[in-house]
Amino acid sequence: MAETKEFKTLYNLFIDSYLQKLAQHSIPTNVTCAIHIGEVIGQFKNCALRITNKCMSNSRLSFTLMVESFIEVISLLPEKDRRAIAEEIGIDLDDVPSVVSKLEKNCNAYAEVNNIIDIQKLNIGECSAPPGQHMLLQIVNTGSAEANCGLQTIVKSLNKIYVPPIIENRLPYYDPWFLVGVAIILVIFTVAICSIRRNLALKYRYGTFLYV
């Protein structure tokens, strides 16, 4: 897989932004994880999975930073598309990131109903790359069942949208004219990864992979 070209989606940009925010925040993220991701399931094709622990003592903050990263990344899309994705996920773009979103309310209810104590299972949907390419899917465990639930929802939506090489990993450096060009390119190149489906189920189980 190392010899193939990496296939980027909006989720890659989102997770880069999210990790940056977690790293820059003053609250330490090296606390003992209250929640571990015990299993990741989905349909995988040419997809590498990485689990990263960035556990925080403030679960509300981790969710807020996640919403901030999501809003930043989908700002690259035309307004109609970004509002459709935000509505699908359960985030109101007219609210500030610190407002409790529909997504967060749903995830709070999910964690309570499923009585998640220390091990959590995630279903990330599809992770597929074309022949000769691979996708790196990075899952960030913040130690919060609610935030992990939010991440699960976001990955299912953003991992369907292809990102041309011209914009990959450059989210913090856009100027206004570059953003206009990016929006046009995304409209042209956006593809649904589900069109290259392959029904191949793969499971990650806690304790069998090395955390990084």
From Swiss-Prot:
Intravirion side: 197-212
Disulphide bridges, residue numbers: C33-C55, C47-C127, C107-C149
Membrane-spanning parts: 176-196
Keyword Transmembrane helix in record: yes
GO cellular component terms listed in the entry, alphabetical order: membrane; viral envelope; virion membrane
Regions annotated as coiled coil: none
Record PTM: Disulfid bonds are oxidized in the cytoplasm by OPG088 protein.
Entry keywords, A to Z: Disulfide bond, Late protein, Membrane, Transmembrane, Transmembrane helix, Viral envelope protein, Virion
Virion surface side stretches: 1-175
Subcellular location: Virion membrane
Keyword Disulfide bond among record annotations: yes
Membrane topology: Single-pass membrane protein
Domain of life the protein comes from: Viruses
Self-association state and partner proteins as the record states: Component of the entry fusion complex (EFC) composed of OPG053, OPG076, OPG086, OPG094, OPG095, OPG099, OPG107, OPG143, OPG104, OPG147 and OPG155. Except for OPG095 and OPG052, each of the EFC proteins is required for assembly or stability of the complex.
Entry similarity comment: Belongs to the orthopoxvirus OPG053 family.
Function: Component of the entry fusion complex (EFC), which consists of 11 proteins. During cell infection, this complex mediates entry of the virion core into the host cytoplasm by a two-step mechanism consisting of lipid mixing of the viral and cellular membranes and subsequent pore formation.
Protein's UniProt name: EFC-associated protein OPG053
Annotated organism of origin: Monkeypox virus
Lineage: Viruses, Varidnaviria, Bamfordvirae, Nucleocytoviricota, Pokkesviricetes
